[in-house]
Amino acid sequence: MPDETEIKLKIRDPKAFQRILKRLGAKPVGSATGRVHEDNLIFDTPDGGLAKHGQLLRLRTETAAAASKKSSKTKKSKKSRKANPPAPAKSSKPTRQILTFKRPTAQQTAAHTSRYPSFGSHKVRDEIEAHVTDSDNLIKIFEGLGMRGWFRYEKYRSTHQLPATNTWAHGFLIEVDETPIGTFVELEGPPAAIDRAATELGYSKKDYILTNYLALYAEDCRRKGQQPQNMLFPDKFR
């Protein structure tokens, strides 16, 4: 099972970050905007058996999204969140669905670090992915095995690639995630490449985030005195 090494970074000023990407020569990947809508559903046993062992089983549905349109400022409702982006138009048919299983590496399991699967400054886990063509029946299979979808979260992801240079032999992917709790960037690859990319983007190791979106969402809810449910955009942002 291949390793996944990654970090997250909080983007405080999305417009300034886009200017940095442009200065670095980053280009969209996959479409004119490199942008997709992701609808994620995490499965677990009723007692949270997978989570207890640092494991994750996720079904992701990706739908192509057009570039967001500039809109006038709107008044925020009590339920709306500060970081909600204007909703890009989505096609009605998913572009792809991916089933992902993640777990601690053998070294982490031996070191009893499954709950916080990271080495040093980077998050490291075993990861395996498979493309799905019949998600409805897959969900029925999971339910038949006693599993259920217990946390759903969505985001808009824009993927950009830095050009191949002496620094990046084959370029480097930068994934920008617009979520209901803010905008983040994910960097995945060899640790040295991640560190170089983070530096180019104006960050240092003290800015690295190693937790997942579920943990970030739960912390956001605690900070606001809200009960965690699903991390979803309000209808007006879809």
Which residues does each PLM region occupy?
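Active-site scaffold segments
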Residues: E129, E186-E188
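Conserved active-site beta-strand-loop modules that form the wall/rim of enzyme catalytic pockets
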Residues: T74, I174, V185
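Conserved residues at beta->alpha junctions
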Residues: I11, E188-G189
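N-terminal strand-loop-strand beta-hairpin
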Residues: M1-G171, D207-R238
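A hydrophobic, small-residue-rich beta->alpha segment in the mid-to-C-terminal subdomain
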Residues: T183, P190-A192, A198-K206
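Beta-strand-connecting loop/turn residues
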Residues: Q55, I181-T183
